[in-house]
Amino acid sequence: MLGPTPELDQTLQAYDYLLPETFIAQTPLVPRDRSRLLVVQQQAHQHKIFQDLVALLQPGDLLVFNDTRVIPARLLGRKLNSELAQPVEVFLLEPRQPNTWLALVRPGRRLKPGAQIEFGPPERPLLRAEILATDADTRGRIIQFESLVEEPFEDLLEQLGEVPLPPYIQESTAQPEQYQTVYAQHPGAVAAPTAGLHFTPELLARLQSEGINQAHLTLHVGIGTFRPVETDDILQHHMHSEWVDLPAATVDAIRTTKASGGRVIAVGTTVTRALEGACQNGPLVPWQGRTNLFIYPSYQWRVVDGLITNFHLPKSSLLMLVSALVGRERLLALYEDAIAQQYRFYSFGDAMLVLPEAVIAERSPDPVF
């Protein structure tokens, strides 16, 4: 077993690896649950198919899912009072108030507070937006939308917007619903919680029939999920924040699972951040708020016992999170084998299951339940 190297674990370069571009999946598999699954055990690892998940978990285990839904966050419009009908791109980041959003706009330098943008056909625009202010933290804009027809903003967004794909997906023929989990419920994300893309309704039903329980929370994945770590010392990295809704039913399910000896398996890094972030200042309770928790090696775990996740970008905070479970050296060795076995990487790629027996990290001594 590879051992921890604490000082090296804090350096950004230690999380680098070489991935040929041909390994970056551009389209999702059909059916979803035919993707490959690298199963991380205590000493060894196995290569399986995602459908095998039923046999790899135990009755009494609890899968926790992120039920956020990706919104059509990219809008193309035109600036009003512009002689040249200047095109404007608006990328919604997060809601601030009803019909009011924080957004990135291009070209931003020409869009000052008071500027207006219209969307839809020029002869019959459907939606209008006004720039209210510049956000000091992101340099984005606070934008208020107004429907120009008898349809709510949410419906117009579905008509006019485009679901954004990650920047490394450039040649995809994927349909918008293929970048949604089958259990997506609450609109608000600008990127999918991709570990959940492998589940089908049939697989969820099989898991339930075998006594593997399911619970949900909501974390609206933000654009910060693609932001690289840029500081040589990762401890100097400022983690982006994301909005979380952890309902009482999920907290109860986690307590019941732990009390009966079951294991909590997070479906994705977003669920991991939400659960661990919710109990940083005390016991796990129902909670709504923002988390900017940065998980890296030496983190002491509180709730999560195991993890289902995709394969992540070099030098990313997500790679550091998974390293906090199994150790950085072992994770990079697993990635090396995945490349040798021609796994597909990133959002539309294959998956990894970190079983609880593979976790080498310490548990927090603080009471959580």
UniProtKB/Swiss-Prot annotation:
Domain of life (superkingdom): Bacteria
Molecular function GO labels: S-adenosylmethionine:tRNA ribosyltransferase-isomerase activity
Any one of the GO CC terms: cytoplasm
UniProt entry tagged with the keyword Oxidoreductase: no
Enzyme Commission number(s) of this protein: 2.4.99.17
Similarity remark: Belongs to the QueA family.
Subunit annotation: Monomer.
HAMAP family: QueA
Protein name (Swiss-Prot/TrEMBL): S-adenosylmethionine:tRNA ribosyltransferase-isomerase
Lineage: Bacteria, Bacillati, Cyanobacteriota, Cyanophyceae, Acaryochloridales
